[in-house]
């Protein structure tokens, strides 16, 4: 069975990838399976740069096909912040709750209709064969930032991200509902179309 390594230790993300790839008889591994590997520093200025950086570096270290995603929250009223700094918006160590608090605090006086935001996901796939360049797909999900947390599901900024088509926070959605509209779900569907060509050599 062919292996694909997903460059994350976030088990929520690993599950999303595993559900997709098992249909193609591809085995998904995560960074938990390679504890000796050091995390790649995300020094890129865009989600795409960071995703390619991670995928490429790990693909060479592991001699495997690696998928890396870089995703985050873009808030119009904050001039695009937290952006590529979404995971560490409130500083180190990474803390979802502190990040949410910081976004809410910075939007404190902003009216709901001006709290437009989107989740963005760039997915890069790198191959151990030196002649194959990394490939990339992306996805977005539009919404608004709520004034307080809602829901228990998901991770990251999901509790404060309001999805209009469901009239719910992302964290109130079932995993099926979330996958149908989420930035990562949309990027994964684009990736799915490419699996035969990119992973199975068809």
Swiss-Prot record:
| Annotated function | Pyrophosphatase that catalyzes the hydrolysis of nucleoside triphosphates to their monophosphate derivatives, with a high preference for the non-canonical purine nucleotides XTP (xanthosine triphosphate), dITP (deoxyinosine triphosphate) and ITP. Seems to function as a house-cleaning enzyme that removes non-canonical purine nucleotides from the nucleotide pool, thus preventing their incorporation into DNA/RNA and avoiding chromosomal lesions.
| Signal peptide location | none
Cited CDD domains: HAM1
The family classification in the record reads:
Belongs to the HAM1 NTPase family.
Under PANTHER family, the record lists: INOSINE TRIPHOSPHATE PYROPHOSPHATASE, INOSINE TRIPHOSPHATE PYROPHOSPHATASE/HAM1 PROTEIN
> What protein is this chain from?
dITP/XTP pyrophosphatase
Recorded hits in NCBIfam families, A to Z, give:
PRK14822.1 (NF011397), RdgB/HAM1 family non-canonical purine NTP pyrophosphatase (TIGR00042)
Task: For this entry, list what GO says about its biological process.
Answer: nucleotide metabolic process; purine nucleoside triphosphate catabolic process
Assembly, in brief, is: Homodimer.
Q: Which molecular function GO terms apply here?
A: dITP diphosphatase activity; ITP diphosphatase activity; metal ion binding; nucleotide binding; ribonucleoside triphosphate phosphatase activity; XTP diphosphatase activity
Q: Per the entry, which co-factors are needed?
A: Mg(2+)
rRNA processing as a keyword of this entry, yes or no, is: no
> Could you tell me the keywords of this UniProt record?
Hydrolase, Magnesium, Metal-binding, Nucleotide metabolism, Nucleotide-binding
Q: Which residues does the record give as substrate binding sites?
A: 8-13, 71, 155-158, 178, 183-184
What cellular component terms from Gene Ontology apply here?
cytosol
Q: In terms of domain of life, where is this protein from?
A: Bacteria
Q: Does the keyword Hydrolase apply?
A: yes
**Residues noted as binding Mg(2+) in the record, renumbered to the chain:** 41, 70
| Catalysed reaction equations from the record | XTP + H2O = XMP + diphosphate + H(+); dITP + H2O = dIMP + diphosphate + H(+); ITP + H2O = IMP + diphosphate + H(+)
- Its EC number(s): 3.6.1.66
Q: Which Pfam families match?
A: Ham1p_like
Q: How is the cofactor bound?
A: Binds 1 Mg(2+) ion per subunit.
Q: Which organism is it from?
A: Bacillus anthracis
According to its UniProt record, which residues of this chain constitute the active site? 70 (proton acceptor)
Kindly report, in one word, the top-level EC class recorded for this enzyme.
Answer: hydrolase
């Amino acid at each position: 069975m062919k292996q694909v390594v997903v460059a994350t230790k976030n088990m929520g993300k690993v599950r999303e990838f595993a559900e997709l790839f098992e249909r193609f008889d591809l085995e998904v591994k995560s960074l938990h399976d390679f504890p000796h590997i050091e995390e790649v520093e995300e020094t890129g200025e865009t989600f795409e740069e960071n995703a390619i950086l991670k995928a490429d570096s790990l693909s060479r270290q592991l001699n495997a096909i690696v998928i890396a995603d870089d995703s985050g929250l873009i808030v119009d009223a904050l001039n695009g912040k937290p952006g590529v700094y979404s995971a560490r918006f409130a500083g180190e160590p990474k803390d979802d709750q502190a990040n949410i608090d910081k976004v809410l605090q910075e939007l404190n006086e902003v009216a709901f209709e001006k709290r437009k935001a989107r989740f963005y996901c760039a997915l890069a796939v790198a191959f151990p064969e030196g002649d194959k360049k990394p490939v990339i797909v992306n996805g977005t999900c539009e919404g608004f930032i709520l004034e307080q947390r809602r829901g228990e599901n998901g991770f990251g900024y999901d509790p404060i991200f309001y999805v209009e088509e469901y009239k719910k926070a992302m964290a109130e959605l079932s995993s099926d509902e979330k996958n149908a509209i989420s930035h990562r779900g949309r990027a994964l569907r684009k990736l799915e179309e490419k699996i035969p060509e990119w992973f199975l050599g068809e």
